[in-house]
Each structure stands twice: as C-alpha cells, then as structure tokens.
Amino acid sequence: MGRRILGQRRGRGTSTFRAPSHRYKADLSHRNVEESDLVTGEVVDIEHDPARSAPLADVQFDDGDRRLVLAPEGVTVGDEIQIGVSAEIAPGNTMPLAEIPEGVPVCNVERQPGDGGKFARASGVSATLLTHDRNAAVVQLPSGEMRRLSPECRATIGVVAGGGRTEKPFVKAGNKHHKMKSRGGKWPRVRGVAMNAVDHPFGGGGRQHPGKPKSVSRDTPPGRKVGDIASKRTGRGGKGGQE
C-alpha cells in the first residue's frame, strides 16, 4: 500500500505548507480616502518584510497615523511623503491617477478606487501611465498588458525599490530554503519518477520512467491524480507534417 503523495499532504493544510503569515509586518495598502486634499508624513525607518521582496518605509503622518508603505527607489529616512489630490509629483507620493502626468512610472496601483493597491508591487517593477481618457486612465502594467482604470484609482509615484533581486544568485541551498520557507513554499521539489514506488505513482523501476500513461481524468482519485490532468492534447503537436 502506498503512502499519501505530496499533493494529498498539501491538501491537509498543515504548517509545513502554510505561509507563516503571523510574521508578516503589514497588509500594505493605501490609507483610506483622504477627507482633505493633502496629508504629509516623514519616513522614520526602512524595514524588511518577510512577506515580500520589496523594502517598506515606516511613515509617521502628521495626523498621528503611522504605517508601513511600499518604498520606491530614492526614498530614504527623513524624506517627506505626501498623500492626496494636491501632492507633488515626487517618488513616494500617492495621488489619484487623474492627477498624475502621462509617462510617469507608478507602483502599487489600485484596481478599484479604495482597494488599497493591487498592481506593480514587487521589487524593481513599475507601471506606466500612458494616457488619460474621458472616463479612464490607461496604464501599462509590468507584464505589458494595458489596463483601463478609473481616474480615481490611486497610485504611488516611482519604481519599487529592490530592483535587480532576480539577478543575484542564491549561491547556497540554505538561502533558497529560507526564501521558500518564508512564503510557505515546499522546496526542494523532487520529480515523481525519481521517487520510490511507495511514494508516487510514477516511482520505482530500474530506470526513471512513468511506467503508465501520464494522462489522467479530472475525476481520478487524489492518490493517482498526477501527470497530465484532463489534458486536451499531449505530445509535440507539430510533428508528422501537420500544419
């Protein structure tokens, strides 16, 4: 009798597979919609959050509110942060898309007005405000996709700090382990054909091969549901003279 495969263990939701969200420092969203046209604050610290790759700025606002916000490139301790309709066009300031000139890089862009920010939040990325229409602002996301958003959606001026992160190698397996552990990822990932027969349907044998068809039905039981699940087609497709 075989053991539970990795997918079945993950489905139980034990601490091995859950992200340690109790260590995360902030939910990271814009302030509530400002009642006045401008609120200012001072950056008192730059912090690291295990939940994300980008650094966070600890901002003390004049109205007594203190919160962590996404830190764009160029923002340092002691800088002034402005939030509101009449904020200046400077890195770190937050305002509606209607008040931002075309061609300015922005980050932490809202999808719907007041949702706190959904787009361009990873380290080193930014979106670009392309143009203003009558009832929409056209924004190019880091993926290249064009989105028509409400002019009332807010965004932060600048590029998210921490760029070049993906260019630096992990060097040691321990570094990769700690990175994956902080997000709840299971690592390393072992191939099924490299396992023993008791651990995976594709395991065992004198050589590494599945030993059975890889295509399985959508209704396959969990312990056998591995490989190409409900695949429409398999193989290399264009071989055999097909157009």
UniProtKB/Swiss-Prot annotation:
* Superkingdom assignment: Archaea
Q: Does the keyword rRNA-binding apply?
A: yes
Q: Which InterPro entries match?
A: NA-bd_OB-fold, Rib_uL2_dom2, Ribosomal_uL2, Ribosomal_uL2_arc_euk, Ribosomal_uL2_C, Ribosomal_uL2_CS, Ribosomal_uL2_dom3, Ribosomal_uL2_RNA-bd_dom
Compositionally biased intervals (Basic and acidic residues): 221-231
Return the annotated region ranges for Disordered.
198-243
Report the record's Gene Ontology biological process terms: cytoplasmic translation
Q: Which cysteines are joined by disulfide bonds?
A: none
Q: Which GO terms describe its cellular component?
A: cytosolic large ribosomal subunit
Q: Which UniProt keywords apply?
A: Ribonucleoprotein, Ribosomal protein, RNA-binding, rRNA-binding
Q: Which Gene3D superfamilies match?
A: 2.30.30.30, Nucleic acid-binding proteins, Ribosomal protein L2, domain 3
Q: Which GO terms describe its molecular function?
A: rRNA binding; structural constituent of ribosome
Please give the family membership noted in the entry.
Belongs to the universal ribosomal protein uL2 family.
Q: Which NCBIfam families match?
A: PRK09612.1 (NF007180)
Q: Sum up the protein's function in the record's words.
A: One of the primary rRNA binding proteins. Required for association of the 30S and 50S subunits to form the 70S ribosome, for tRNA binding and peptide bond formation. It has been suggested to have peptidyltransferase activity; this is somewhat controversial. Makes several contacts with the 16S rRNA in the 70S ribosome.
Q: How does it assemble?
A: Part of the 50S ribosomal subunit. Forms a bridge to the 30S subunit in the 70S ribosome.
Query: What name does this protein carry?
Result: Large ribosomal subunit protein uL2
Q: Which organism is it from?
A: Natronomonas pharaonis (strain ATCC 35678 / DSM 2160 / CIP 103997 / JCM 8858 / NBRC 14720 / NCIMB 2260 / Gabara)
Q: Which gene encodes it?
A: rpl2
